[in-house]
């Protein structure tokens, strides 16, 4: 089985390769002393060229001490790699009960299908291309070997939208004439499978994916539905779904430029009041959502010790591909970058704000781990290195923003006991 060296090596980890490299050296004769070190050349460019050896090893692209990259050349490869990372399906470890298959040209269905990633359904998302299943997807599907369960009502493959499924799997089709209709049908399907109504519903733009992408990670984390609205109106399937989900708390992700107050007023005419989250900057929009919480809704990531996922806002289907990383492992929200080379200032500030720290013992500290989605043409190795540095555990000093109080600069003496006052016979004190 071949699923793409870059994608799978990044997803499955590098430990096995390192082990074999070390093991192979055991029987080798002792090497000759190395030749004199070459002359050091200082490069004046911002980025130094990577040595050939580093390129062959795959580091630091595949992983650094605080990051792991899913290095797929496109969203199809990213989805296959993430699915196999979350469900290794080897060594006696079972695969998922079901898988969702989504058209690679339909980012809206991918975001909406993320609610099926959440337990107990736990269906990772794979991508197809209309009437043809890509070899990466077919190989991943074979390795995952979904077997159905009571939680999926025996379904092994959820066919989302207009895609041709591979043969031999128990399939349930979710179809519709528009992204809004498909999203509403996915909402109904999850309710049927879990026999529960959602407590919360997340409304996103069906036309501006850079604001909608973070919804996929929350849907995977919570199982709550994602429904689509237009800028100034609400599609009929969304209205019908909101009426069915009567009583749920409603949240809208994105600025008024993506979802206007007029559209939200139309929602409120048939359902509950809507709370808006987000910002006109897509990077800050995702950060605001990662920080947000209201009751049981929201990530509330405002301190160190968490997983995070970073994708490019130019690759909306990577949000769906990466969704299983938000429903297992270190359960992280999706953040986005609009620059492939440099960490955006808003993202840099957020990572510094939740940067982990320690007072005296780093082994007792909490850590942040960050998944990078896409190959280095999507997100550069330089940006990955910057993220790794921002996530690094650091000794706590005053003003580090790690939410850990630094130790006092000098040992504090206990307060001296005040001298006792002479007592009168009646037990009172003298004036």
Which residue stretches match the model-derived regions?
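Extracellular glycan-binding segments that recognize GlcNAc-based cell-wall polysaccharides
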Residues: 3-8, 15-22, 30-431
